[in-house]
Amino acid sequence: VAVSKFHPAADVERVASYGQIDFGENYVQEAMQKRNELDLPDLRWHMIGHVQSRKAPAVAGKFVLLHTLDSIKLSNALEKTLNSKNIGQTALIEVNIGGEEQKSGVMANELPQLVEHVLAHCPHLKLEGLMCLPPVFDAGEAARPFFARLRLLRDELRKNFDLPLPQLSMGMSGDFEWAIAE
């Protein structure tokens, strides 16, 4: 996923001309503006930024993957819109893997409750895996324990909820090798 936040639509178009089709945006309004400017229906847009519950109607069903599902409140807001339009939305649950107050994401100990809620009450949301941003930004190997912890959490959910959860979204340019290793 190429992160295109703060880059103009012309840059997205240029990168897409080289074969890149997956683009990640942090802000709903910026993503929608670029999508409207570009006549490129084959692009796959990812929402990688925090989504407030009140913005759920603008997100629901508009992205190939929502990387930042982080609360029961947001899952309910998404489900309401998805149900009214009879469409689905694939999502990753964002886990606050470092337990940092300033970061978004569900705390690891609350993760099973969120999964249980989505499975029981949000039939239009399809859980595909987990996402995290480690507390050490672009720190190479120092991020690896956080990636390992996310993988273990995913493995526990697979076992306890009988879910495939094939995706782990973790790592950026400075630590992606360690994310892949996990």
Model-derived features: positions:
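Conserved alpha/beta-domain cores
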Residues: V1-G174
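Non-catalytic positions within long, well-ordered alpha-helices that form the structural scaffold/packing
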Residues: A16, I180-A181
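Hydrophobic residues within well-ordered alpha-helices
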Residues: V59, A179-I180
